[in-house]
């Protein structure tokens, strides 16, 4: 995790308590804790400390949010503890891909904890696991679909 993705956790916890939302940020707490001050200064953002995690997530774990079941897929590379959350719903397949995948690209690996080889393995894993009709919601900017990325993203051409 990076400061720009965990900054809202404290506010959410103040409203809803230790909910599933906090679990999304808890996979690898060493990177944000070690670098959060550096990230705040580099990006010029103020983010409250997210506090202690309520649960650490691992590959295959599930999170229930209402009647939706989110499956945890470990996707290190942008950060060591990166995850994607996938749900197959009546309305269609959806994946919260964070900064692992972007339209035509992938997340940065030049920041602290980034690993180019790991993110390439993560993209290959997503290409095999996620159905083509999956809508991918990114951590920044536009959404995409697995079908589009499999056709157009040079980092998914394996």
Can you say where each PLM-predicted feature lies in the sequence?
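Metallo-beta-lactamase
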Residues: 39-41, 62, 68-74, 79-158
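Active-site HxH/HxHxD metal-binding segment of metal-dependent hydrolases
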Residues: 1-63, 151-155
């Amino acid at each position: 995790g990076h400061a720009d993705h965990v900054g809202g956790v404290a506010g959410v916890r103040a409203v809803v308590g230790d909910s599933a939302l906090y679990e999304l940020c808890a996979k690898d707490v060493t990177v944000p804790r070690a670098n959060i001050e550096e990230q705040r200064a580099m990006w010029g953002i103020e983010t409250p400390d997210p506090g202690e995690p309520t649960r650490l997530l691992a590959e295959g774990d599930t999170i229930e949010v209402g009647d939706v079941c989110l499956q945890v897929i470990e996707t290190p590379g942008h950060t060591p503890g990166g995850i994607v959350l996938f749900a197959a719903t009546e309305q269609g397949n959806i994946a919260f891909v964070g900064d692992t995948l972007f339209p035509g690209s992938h997340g940065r690996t030049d920041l602290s904890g980034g690993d180019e080889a790991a993110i390439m393995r993560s993209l290959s894993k997503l290409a095999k696991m996620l159905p083509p009709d999956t809508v991918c919601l990114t951590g920044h900017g536009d959404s995409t679909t697995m079908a589009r990325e499999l056709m157009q993203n040079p980092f998914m051409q394996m």
